[in-house]
Regions:
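Acidic, glycine-rich calcium-binding repeat modules characteristic of RTX/beta-roll
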Residues: 49-117
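Low-complexity acidic/polar repeat-biased segments
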Residues: 3-29, 37-41, 119-161
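Hydrophobic residues in beta-strands and at strand termini
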Residues: 1, 84, 111, 141-144
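Extracellular repeat-rich scaffold modules on cell surfaces
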Residues: 1-78
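Short, histidine-centered active-site or binding-site loop motifs used for metal coordination
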Residues: 44, 86, 134
Length: 161
């Protein structure tokens, strides 16, 4: 969200969307605005597939509860924390949550119920795949990130979820 502007969610496309003027909208549809000079630093998606986008400040972003749905997280600058939990992980790589702009040395992956020693860091067609070793579930895909750059310094323990 950017101060003084609107963000749409669900099936709503903008402030002039005809759905807003009818009785056809439903839970999960909406339009949200915040005041000028306001900055939101944390965002949590819902239980479906979400595209959660931060702003230029240090954001903490979490795709929301639900395994088997693909969330995409984008920090958009700042030293961001991308939160993951084993309960959201999946064995289906096509449904794994992804981080579209992870910056090694600046951003962090926040682990809710894991530690770095629980993980395997692997190559996946030029992306980095972060796996819980015990369950073989994928916690995150880091789009376009060389897996050899990722080490324990990229992870922190969080209590966000």
């Amino acid at each position: 969200l950017n101060g003084g502007s609107f963000s749409c969610f669900g099936n709503i496309t903008g402030v002039d969307d005809p759905t807003l003027k009818s009785d056809s909208w439903s839970a999960g549809d909406g339009l949200l605005g915040i005041a000028y000079n306001s900055v939101i630093e944390n965002a949590i998606g819902g239980s479906a597939s979400d595209n959660v986008v931060g702003n230029g400040v240090a954001n903490t972003l979490y795709g929301g509860a639900g395994s088997g749905v693909k969330d995409t997280l984008t920090g958009n600058g700042g030293a961001d924390i991308f939160v993951c939990s084993l309960s959201d992980a999946t064995t289906d790589l096509s449904l794994a949550d992804s981080i579209s702009d992870f910056t090694d040395g600046t951003d962090f992956i926040g682990l809710e119920d894991r530690t770095y020693s629980d993980l395997s860091i692997l190559n996946s067609s030029g992306d980095t795949k972060i796996i819980d070793t015990n369950s073989s579930k994928v916690l995150f895909l880091l789009d376009g990130v060389d897996h050899t750059l990722i080490d324990s310094s990229d992870f922190i323990i969080t209590d966000f979820v």
